[in-house]
Design a protein with these regions (language model features):
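Substrate-binding rim/cap in mid-to-C-terminal beta-strand-loop elements of soluble/periplasmic
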Residues: 181, 316
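Flexible loop/hinge segments that line or gate small-molecule binding clefts
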Residues: 149-177, 183-186
């Protein structure tokens, strides 16, 4: 089996994506498993490489290409499909200092337009079969909206440009995986979205998503919405009126839900970590994100930076493969050469595994 081609978006040019990408592609084992192609800008990647060489001693070269077939896919050379969207004079250059400083640009229309176009391009490549999987670095939701692209994140862009109606986000770190009934909406709206049809569809997608990464007989946990799953309607009726009927329908389809009922949100993740579930269906964004980030993120208060930023975001239900970092743009530190690449490494691993399983 040939190694899969991974299309990796650079992310916001003023965020941590370029330097994270350089760090991740400094690992030879990446090239042993896949053929990575960065979709972004040579100007940003060149600056990230210059800073990485100064801060970490990384010694790589860049190969600008206009087509996938022009890529070398050789360790030591990063192939960049150069979109030519970021002028060099827009990148604050402090690489001559002993300690390069963060860009300090933050969210802006230029960064939003560029990062949106990288995503659009990598989707086109995947839909055309020119790349086998896509991996995305962080973009700024504020920036892409400043540029006139009114989406709430990567997931919605992918759904729109692949014409997908039924999809959901899966977050994963090691043996903890979650999928969401709703994501980028207010908490008030998230409660309104807990409906039987949505919950059932997420259970189905979670089941298929686990199978796609090689779990043959997934065990699925379904979190309740309310404290103690509502205590038989005392603290809310969503569990009785919406979640339980969805579980009953899923069980009738042969999907394995060991509890056969919703599990209280404050215990469901401990059970998942103990191996009782392979994946948990959660009712809203933070219900799933908080446990994943408690497990995968480590903050060093002395150094005032993240020592570990682990985890991956996979969009399930798409006709193409998309895995992403599970963190933001890091505008406050981006450009200084101290970003952590672990989440991108995780995303690339998932992209490779999903591509291999799809080909098998």
């Amino acid at each position: 089996m040939s190694k899969p081609i991974l299309g990796i978006t650079m992310g916001d040019p003023f965020g941590n994506g370029p330097e994270i990408t350089v760090r991740a592609l400094n690992d030879k084992t990446v090239y042993d498993r896949c053929r990575p192609l960065v979709v972004g800008d040579m100007t940003s990647m060149a600056y990230a490489l210059k800073v990485a060489k100064k801060v970490l001693g990384i010694d790589l070269t860049l190969n600008p290409v206009k087509d996938v077939k022009d890529a070398k896919f050789t360790y030591g050379t990063i192939d960049v499909l150069d979109m030519g969207l970021v002028p060099a004079d827009k990148i604050p250059d402090t690489s001559d200092l002993d300690e390069p400083k963060p860009f300090g640009v933050g969210a802006c229309a230029l960064g939003g337009e560029a990062s949106f176009q990288y995503v659009k391009k990598v989707i086109e490549l995947a839909m055309a079969g020119e790349v086998d999987a896509t991996c995305t670095n962080a973009l700024s939701k504020e920036a892409i909206n400043m540029a006139g692209h009114h989406y709430s994140g990567h997931t919605e862009i992918y759904a729109d440009y692949t014409h997908t109606d039924k999809y959901t986000m899966m977050l994963a770190h090691e043996d903890l995986r979650v999928v969401h009934v709703s994501t980028h909406v207010s908490l008030r709206e998230a409660c309104d979205r807990v409906k039987k049809a949505r919950v059932l569809e997420c259970i189905r997608i979670a089941n298929e998503g686990c199978k796609a990464i090689g779990i043959k007989e997934p065990k699925i946990g379904v979190a309740g919405l309310n404290p103690h799953c509502g205590e038989n309607g005392m603290f809310g009726t969503e569990e009785i009126e919406e979640i339980q009927p969805a579980i009953d329908a899923a069980l009738a389809e042969g999907i394995n839900i060991p509890e056969k009922k919703p599990t209280p949100p404050d215990t469901v993740f401990s059970k998942a970590l103990g191996g009782w579930y392979d994946i948990v269906v959660v009712m809203y964004h933070d219900q799933g994100h908080i446990p994943l980030k408690v497990k995968g993120f480590v903050y060093n208060k002395q150094e005032k930076h993240w020592e570990a930023v682990a985890g991956v975001n996979v969009t399930l239900g798409l006709p193409i493969i998309r895995a992403s970092v599970d963190h933001g743009t890091g505008f406050g530190h981006a450009g200084s050469g101290h970003a952590n690449e672990l989440s991108l490494v995780n995303a690339m691993d998932y992209g490779i595994r999903l591509a291999e399983n799809r080909k098998a």
